[in-house]
Swiss-Prot record:
Active-site annotation: 47
Name of the molecule in the record: tRNA pseudouridine synthase B
HAMAP family with a match to the protein in the record: TruB_bact
Gene Ontology molecular function terms on file: RNA binding; tRNA pseudouridine(55) synthase activity
Key words of the record: Isomerase, tRNA processing
Family classification: Belongs to the pseudouridine synthase TruB family. Type 1 subfamily.
Gene giving rise to this polypeptide: truB
GO annotation terms (biological process): mRNA pseudouridine synthesis; tRNA pseudouridine synthesis
């Protein structure tokens, strides 16, 4: 007989405001424990130094976390000019010090170089793997391995301020963009070196900044629930966003309840008006209940790709 997973069935997304100094996995496990969720996963790690938006998917929402991994991100970053470190951030050792002598015109010209579609060579201090091992493990042993450049897009790069030797930028970029690498490359282009001293992720996809919560806020709600002798879920669950927000940019296909049984068994159903290979959000009936994602095939049929398991316990919806 299959063993029931520990924790309760709860499906939704927490917009965690990660604090500095902790790993993304540590933050994930804390959220999972606060919600007593049977399953949890994050949607793109932040360095321990970094703070800000870390969407945590609970329960069936984990099936759609890849779509948030692929989403655009936005960051506020402050760089210290005149010093280059081995990790390109303040957690590393200073390896070179140079005077800061560039002009404002040179700075603005250098920033223009990073806008749009470019190629980026990932830092050795990254979680990308080479022969099964994360690059940072090689770096810590003083070993440099070959890395191929990867295409990235910087949609916006806004100059915020330059105060003394500290430069602050706002960067809206595609998935897989390493902000530390942008800062290191910028420092070399300016001839003075630079490294990240503050990094805050302010946006993932279209999630609102104002919806973020900290671990301290979650812990306070759990404490409050215990003091009031109520289940913590009463105070915590209203913070969850519906899991279909992870695929909010997909067009919706509403399927009649009569077709639900076919879909939930993995069978394709006929839908008109959409091109082949279009990924869609599937909802059922007049309530537009989200049940997963699918794709249109060449025959005009909607084939389910990722469907949720519907439990007796509540699913977070609008």
């Amino acid at each position: 007989m299959a063993r029931r997973p520990k924790g309760r069935f709860i499906d939704g997304i927490v917009l965690l405001d990660k604090s500095t100094g902790m790993s993304s996995n540590f933050a994930l496990q804390r959220v999972k424990r606060f919600f007593n969720a049977n399953k949890a996963g994050h949607t793109g790690a932040l360095d321990p130094l970094a703070t800000g938006m870390l969407p945590v998917c609970l329960g069936e929402a984990t099936k759609f976390s890849q779509h948030l991994l692929d989403a655009d991100k936005r960051y506020l970053v402050t760089a210290k000019l005149g010093e280059r470190t081995d990790t390109s951030d303040s957690d590393g050792e200073v390896v070179q010090t140079r005077p800061v002598t560039f002009t404002e015109a040179q700075l603005l010209s250098a920033l223009e170089h990073f806008r749009g579609d470019t190629q980026q060579v990932p830092s050795m201090y990254s979680a990308l793997k080479y022969q099964g091992q994360p690059l940072y493990k090689y770096a810590r042993e003083g070993i440099e391995v070959p890395r191929e450049s990867r295409p990235i897009t910087v949609f916006e790069l806004n100059f915020i301020s330059l105060e003394g030797d500290e430069l602050t930028l706002d960067i809206h970029c595609s998935k897989g963009t390493y902000i530390r690498t942008i800062i290191d490359d910028l420092g070399e282009m300016l001839g003075c070196g630079a490294h990240v001293i503050m990094l805050r992720r302010t946006q993932v996809a279209q999630y609102p900044y104002a919806k973020m919560v900290t671990l301290e806020q979650l812990e306070a709600l759990v404490t409050q629930a215990h003091e009031q002798q109520i289940d913590p879920s009463v105070l915590l669950d209203p913070l969850l966003l519906p899991m279909d927000t992870a695929v909010a940019d997909f067009p919706e296909v509403n399927v009649p309840e009569a077709s639900a049984a076919y879909l939930m068994q993995g069978q394709a159903v006929r839908v008109t008006g959409l091109k082949a290979d279009t990924l869609v959000r599937i909802t059922l009936g007049d309530a537009h209940r989200f049940v997963g994602i699918g794709a249109m095939n060449d025959d005009g049929l909607l084939a389910p790709k990722r469907l949720i398991v519907i439990h007796d316990e509540p699913i977070v919806t609008d």
